[in-house]
Regions:
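N-terminal signal peptide c-region/cleavage motif recognized by signal peptidases
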Residues: 14-17
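Short N-proximal segments of mature Sec-exported proteins
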Residues: 20-84
Length: 119
């Protein structure tokens, strides 16, 4: 079942990612499916939304990591789930930023949660 959801998520995310109009508000909406999926009570549609939430966060994180971003310094072994939890918490605590682009909000959340030590 999880493999099927991930496949559907990957197919759907490919049509969303290039548009560039994905907002923090849309991300927060999909986090509801993520929460329900973690609890084991998600419908298929909610599980897909939860998978899209996690996949979008992982994609933004990986993109910035490949570009050599030095503002996010998670401990080794950070899971997509932990990053997703951090972003979801940030979205709930900063509703004034829901109109920001999803990548911007994700980077703000991860930078706040996993700051780098400055020497």
């Amino acid at each position: 079942m999880i493999k099927q959801v991930l496949l559907i998520t990957a197919l759907m995310a490919s049509s969303v990612a290039h548009a560039g109009f994905y907002s923090g508000s849309a991300l927060l909406s999909e986090s509801e499916g993520y929460v329900k999926n973690k609890s084991g009570v998600a419908t298929v549609a909610e599980a897909v939304n939860g998978g899209m939430f996690m996949g979008y966060i992982a994609g933004v994180f990986d993109t910035y990591a490949m570009q050599g971003n030095r503002n996010i310094c998670p401990k080794a072994g950070l899971s997509v789930g932990s990053a997703s939890d951090a972003v979801m918490q940030y979205l709930n605590e900063h509703p004034e930023q829901l109109n920001y682009s999803a990548p911007s909000v994700i980077m703000l959340a991860l930078t706040a949660t996993f700051p780098c030590e400055r020497h």
